[in-house]
């Protein structure tokens, strides 16, 4: 490769990345996933597009995709709170194992019928497209106010279900590639334990060693993120080399780093944010270049039937079977989890395996995987907002600061600087700072007014448009945001959480007298928390509700996984009038 070729490679690569970045706002305007934009740019630059770039180097595509996926999962793991495992761990594990297996089998049977394949070949197609994609799920759910049980389940499932798909794909390729491979129960069990066991062990052990190294060594600030990424990639590669799941390993590594007091954690996350965007762009550009759109047209109708069958038939059945033991999930939540079974880069990466193994029909598998991913991103990704509304799993947006920055004043500092812009509707306008009910240990470090820095004191009165810089920790975020952020409209909050709020310790007898409810003797002696336990179980989340005595009772506040307030939704005025008559 000469200097001119290398320079051309840099120019074309930079141009495609720049175009992808500049076109990213188009996704929100058109209501389509941003990943689809990156994929489309790659396809337009390919051999059937205006770029006429002929790219069919599957090993390079495999390398780029795995590198990108590893970085995305490291970032996703660091941003996942272990606390969410309380409500989502076992449902996620069930979906990541049993759910993937059921989806694989049902999709495989459909593929066998549609494309005249053998049973094993059809199930291989099902295994390739059987898992949800972490890059797609993390990207599309980012910034969404979802019911925590649903949101955490989807994110943890997407970060942990790839090992099952890899296990099934690799096993089936081994069987199809060699008649001597013994597909016995012992072989399958050993392969399964190796994928998950080695992956989990190396992820946790390697993650702990990496965390120790980061905290132990005094390095320039910019090197901690490089150490975190290089260490994560080493764990990813070592796990793969030992027959484990590198995908699971690096996700668990990120989970450990993000949930322990890690030196320069905020700086690492800031760097990872940019690297994750670059990884997503690069991965989908390369995968877009790899496909030949004219070949997709040859399988368009049966490919569409396969994708629709998986979305409307295989995935919902798998979700309902996988979540059957978990009574806390409502039918609406199960349907939403079914719908957000987004496919992305992972199925396309898995479809490269048969190409590299030289299996018959390998090109068909690849084209099918690509087609299914495109349909999934367009149909499921494009209707995500509508699905959230129909399933009623979306919460009112939480008040947030306009910016937040980590303050690394000591190695494992949890301090952050939160920036707030005061709006006219805030009660603190005109109040001196000494009158604010600030969380204990927090402090307003600076106030900016008309682009001028003020030195705040207890007598400083706040004005509309002031910008406040507040020193605090993440645990203080909710209280501070209630004080200073632009809050959602009261009408929308009332529609969601109810017209009145009741303390969880309130006696049902008092509630009955207040709202004219007819209670039996046993109910009259109970408290509101007993009613919540009876209807919602031990781990309700914000936004859960139940019907009782013709009223809707909504979980309106949760602190440390304990319900503290219940919202009461009254029937519409017309129903109240009819009842009075």
From Swiss-Prot:
It is a multi-pass membrane protein. The chain crosses the membrane at residues 3-23, 30-50, 58-78, 87-107, 109-129, 192-212, 232-252, 271-291, 304-324, 335-355, 364-384. Belongs to the monovalent cation:proton antiporter 1 (CPA1) transporter (TC 2.A.36) family. NhaP2 subfamily. Gene3D superfamilies: 1.20.1530.20, Regulator of K+ conductance, C-terminal domain (3.30.70.1450). Pfam families: CorC_HlyC, Na_H_Exchanger, TrkA_C. SUPFAM superfamilies: FAD-binding/transporter-associated domain-like, TrkA C-terminal domain-like. GO terms for cellular component: plasma membrane. K(+)/H(+) antiporter that extrudes potassium in exchange for external protons and maintains the internal concentration of potassium under toxic levels. It is found in: Cell inner membrane. It comes from the Bacteria. GO terms for biological process: cell volume homeostasis; intracellular potassium ion homeostasis. Residues 405-486 form the RCK C-terminal domain. GO terms for molecular function: flavin adenine dinucleotide binding; potassium:proton antiporter activity. The keyword Cell inner membrane applies. This is K(+)/H(+) antiporter NhaP2. Signal peptide: none annotated. Keywords: Antiport, Cell inner membrane, Cell membrane, Ion transport, Membrane, Potassium, Potassium transport, Transmembrane, Transmembrane helix, Transport. It comes from Vibrio cholerae serotype O1 (strain ATCC 39315 / El Tor Inaba N16961). The keyword Cell wall biogenesis/degradation does not apply. It catalyses: K(+)(in) + H(+)(out) = K(+)(out) + H(+)(in).
């Amino acid at each position: 490769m000469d200097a001119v070729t290398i320079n051309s490679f840099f120019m074309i690569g930079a141009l495609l990345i720049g175009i992808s970045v500049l076109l990213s706002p188009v996704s929100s305007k058109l209501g389509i996933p941003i990943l689809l934009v990156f994929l489309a740019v790659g396809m337009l630059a390919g051999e059937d597009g205006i770029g006429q770039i002929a790219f069919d180097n599957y090993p390079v595509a495999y390398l780029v995709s795995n590198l990108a996926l590893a970085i995305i999962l490291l970032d996703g793991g660091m941003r996942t709170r272990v606390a969410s495992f309380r409500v989502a761990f076992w449902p996620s594990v069930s979906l990541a194992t049993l759910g993937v297996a059921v989806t694989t089998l049902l999709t495989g049977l459909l593929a066998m019928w549609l494309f005249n394949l053998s049973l094993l070949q059809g199930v291989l197609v099902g295994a390739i497209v059987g898992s949800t994609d972490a890059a797609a799920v993390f990207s599309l759910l980012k910034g969404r106010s979802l019911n925590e049980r649903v949101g955490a389940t989807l994110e943890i499932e997407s970060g942990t279900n790839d090992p099952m798909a890899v296990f099934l794909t690799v096993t089936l390729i081994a069987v199809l590639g060699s008649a001597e491979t013994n597909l016995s129960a012992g072989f399958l069990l050993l392969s399964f334990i190796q994928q998950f066991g080695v992956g989990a062990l190396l992820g946790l052990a390697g993650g702990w060693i990496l965390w120790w190294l980061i905290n132990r060594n005094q390095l320039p600030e910019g090197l901690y993120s490089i150490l975190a990424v290089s260490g994560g990639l080493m764990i990813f590669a070592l796990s793969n080399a030992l027959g484990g799941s590198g995908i699971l390993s690096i996700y668990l590594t990120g989970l450990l780093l993000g949930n322990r007091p890690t030196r320069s954690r905020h700086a690492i996350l800031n760097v990872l944010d940019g690297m994750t965007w670059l990884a997503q762009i690069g991965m989908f550009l390369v995968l877009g270049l790899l496909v030949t759109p004219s070949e997709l047209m040859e399988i368009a109708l049966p490919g569409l039937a396969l994708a629709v069958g998986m979305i409307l038939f295989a995935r919902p059945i798998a979700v309902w079977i996988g979540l059957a033991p978990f009574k806390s999930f409502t039918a609406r939540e199960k349907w939403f989890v079914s719908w957000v079974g987004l496919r992305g880069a992972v199925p396309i990466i898995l479809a490269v395996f048969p190409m590299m193994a030289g299996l018959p029909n390998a090109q068909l598998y690849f084209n099918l995987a690509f087609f299914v991913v495109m349909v999934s991103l367009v149909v499921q990704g494009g209707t995500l907002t509508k699905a959230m509304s129909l399933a009623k799993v979306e919460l009112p947006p939480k008040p947030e600061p306009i910016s937040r920055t980590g303050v690394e004043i000591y190695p494992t500092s949890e301090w952050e600087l939160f920036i707030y812009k005061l709006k006219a509707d805030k009660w603190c306008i005109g109040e001196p700072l000494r009158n604010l009910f600030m969380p204990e240990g927090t402090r307003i470090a600076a106030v900016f007014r008309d682009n001028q820095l003020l030195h705040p004191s207890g007598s400083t009165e706040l004005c509309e448009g002031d910008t406040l810089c507040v020193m605090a920790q993440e645990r203080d975020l909710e209280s501070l945001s209630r004080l200073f952020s632009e809050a959602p409209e009261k009408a929308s909050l009332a529609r969601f959480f109810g017209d009145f709020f009741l303390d969880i310790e309130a006696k049902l007898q008092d509630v009955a007298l207040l709202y004219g409810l007819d209670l039996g003797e046993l109910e009259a002696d109970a408290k509101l928390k007993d009613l919540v336990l009876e209807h919602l179980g031990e781990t309700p989340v914000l936004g859960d509700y139940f019907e009782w005595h013709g009223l809707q009772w909504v979980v309106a506040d949760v602190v440390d996984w304990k319900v503290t307030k219940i919202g009461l939704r009254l029937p519409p005025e017309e129903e109240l009038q009819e009842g009075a008559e």
